[in-house]
Amino acid sequence: MKPAMRRRAFLKRAGAFTAFTVLPARLLRSETAPSNQLTRALLGFGGIAHSGNHLGYKATRLVALCDPDAKRVQDGIAQAEKNGYGKIFACRDFREILARPDVDIIHICTPPHWHGLMSVMAAQAGKDIWCEKPMTRTIGEGRRVMEAVKTNGRIFRLNTWFRFQSGFYGFGTEVKPLKKIMENRLLGWPVKAVVGSVTGFSLKFGWSGQTNIIPQPVPADFDYDLWLGPAPFKPYHPHRTHGTFRGYWDYDGGGLGDMGQHYLDPVQYLLEKDETSPIKVEIDCPPQHPDAVGSFRRITYTYADGCQIVLDGNDSLQGAPFLEGPKGKIWPKLKSDIPNLEAIVAELPEPAPQQTDFVESVKLRRAFALNERNGFRSATIVNLGIVAMRLGRGFAFDPVKLCAVNDPAADRFIYQPMRSPWVM
């Protein structure tokens, strides 16, 4: 398919699905289906799609997958059969999957430069969405995803889970006791959170790009133009794609883009900021290459009520608490200067329950715990930091208008154009 025909052809093919914007297609066809089990398709079959959690997720039935790399398509077919799914539909172009009536859930496992556009197109095609982190590569794309999910009545799940289950990386406890502490203001208010290796969170600066790569021929079995999609055209080099794409601004944001939403979404939840964003970003970082992601020494986010998040990139805050308020501090493993803290926490009421069963969310049309709205806000923290890195300075942000304050240079990174013919 020629590039200029992409959007028009997709909309023509997807038009038949506009009626399916309330209930999943599988449930609408339940009278002829062998079961009411929801069906799922994987868009992208790289490292994350190979994980046992995704291939082994039997609450839905995997029926399709795609990847612009033909070798990965063949690998996906083999892995699906190995995991008991039998023969599935597999292709290179994701639009073929969006046009299929037998797919209920689109699971986006691509590099982040595709997350926003695929989410919007999936919503327009009447599919529910399971998207890997970060939710989107830019704030503008995230805003558009929120609009598309709402307009089309879809259910959206962002795949980071530390606000509601499992351990909190290297912190040494779960988020729930921290939430109880914060809800009951045991630390006072406002609160500062420090995120870095000193508090148990690796910022993974190893995800940096190369600045001296020499263009190479595109492999015959790899559709590089489709892999780039909405990203600016750059000559092919294997380091720009597959397992090392995170080191380039066009596709992700290095270690901050990779791990930032995992770490910062629970912090946002603890600070009660699911419906807003920082009003100011400050940064200390070396000059950044225009193409390859580098590192930073410190990023500080400030909210309107005085709460702060500090990303410590060079371990300069040795001994710093993870959470600090006017009444107390908390370090990893729930160590604190508040006497008998664990006993106090044990007596506190439980936080409000969260909707953490995605299949139930889809069937009952109930918002998932981490959805397009609060997921957008935690992705915005990540993307504000990335904008500051690329600018080499801080800036003010309007969390209502979702733009920089009197700063066109910052807005050019917040709202980035897509490579023609791709549009949102």
Task: Annotate the PLM regions.
Residues 304-308, 327-328:
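Glycine-centered tight beta-turn/hairpin loop motif at sheet-sheet or coil-to-beta transitions
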Residues 215-218, 225-305:
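Rossmann-like dinucleotide-binding domain that binds NAD(P)(H)
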Residues 128, 136-221:
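A contiguous active-site-proximal alpha/beta segment in oxidoreductase catalytic domains
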Residues 181-204, 219, 223-237, 279-288, ...:
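NAD(P)-dependent dehydrogenases' Rossmann-like dinucleotide-binding region
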Residues 2-131, 140-155:
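N-terminal glycine-/serine-/threonine-rich beta1-alpha1-beta2 phosphate-ribose binding loop
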Residues 13-17, 238, 252-272, 296-298, ...:
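C-terminal helical cap and adjacent loop that interface with cofactors, partners, or active-site loops
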Residues 11, 74-77, 95-98, 107, ...:
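Non-transmembrane alpha-helical segments in soluble domains
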Residues 73, 112-114, 130, 143, ...:
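Tryptophan-centric aromatic hotspots in well-structured domains and transmembrane helices
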